[in-house]
Amino acid sequence: MIKILIPTAKEMKVCQNIARPKLSAQTKIIIDYFSTLTVSDLEDIYRINTSAARCEAQRWQDFKSKQLTLNPAIKLFNGLMYRNIKRHNLSTSEAQFMENSVFITSALYGIIPAMTLISPHRLDFNTKIKINNNSLKVFWRENYDTFMQSDDIMVSLLSNEFETVFSPKERQKLIHLNFIEDRDGQLKTHSTISKKARGKCLTAMMENNCQTLEHLKQLRFDGFCYDNELSDSKQLTFVKKQT
């Protein structure tokens, strides 16, 4: 079975669903840390203005309450990749694929199924804080490595920021997907191409219930198709010809 790892996003689209949160012990440790910080502290950590820091301070205080605004993670995050993922009006098969095969790598929650209910927050692995005297990457490493202890095929749609949370040994198990545009023989890629293509690729995998690498290689999405010459056992490259 294939499991697909995707990153979080800074941009969020919040819905008002109030419920009692279920939080892991590690998540609670991070919340306890941030809930003690002042607005001034958050300005420095996030490098944001006072108004934005006040908003973040309130969010961390809200985590300490018994009820929170919760959203399915796949619908809360709303960056470019997420906006190119089919997230609404899913068929039964598509919903099952989303629940069982798509996982979000979070600096607050760990690795979670895409439909997990979570709350709005600002935190990534580049945030310069220490939790139990460790960076966030080190703090989560054992949890992330444990996720890799299965026979599933691990497909990474992650940036380097998220992949380096895994130990080097576990990182070697990841299958990376690359997305390139061919413009008159010139191969080009940049973050916008990659983010859009990741979302389109994930949608195609979900719609086709893709469970093997061979099936993945056969997919066509948004003009992209698999290029064997530019690929190897750990790097699958998809090319889109532009005229």
From Swiss-Prot:
It comes from the Bacteria. GO terms for biological process: response to hydroperoxide. Transmembrane segments: none annotated. One of its GO terms (cellular component) is cytosol. Signal peptide: none annotated. Belongs to the UPF0246 family. This is UPF0246 protein gbs2036. It comes from Streptococcus agalactiae serotype III (strain NEM316). The lineage of its organism: Bacteria, Bacillati, Bacillota, Bacilli, Lactobacillales.
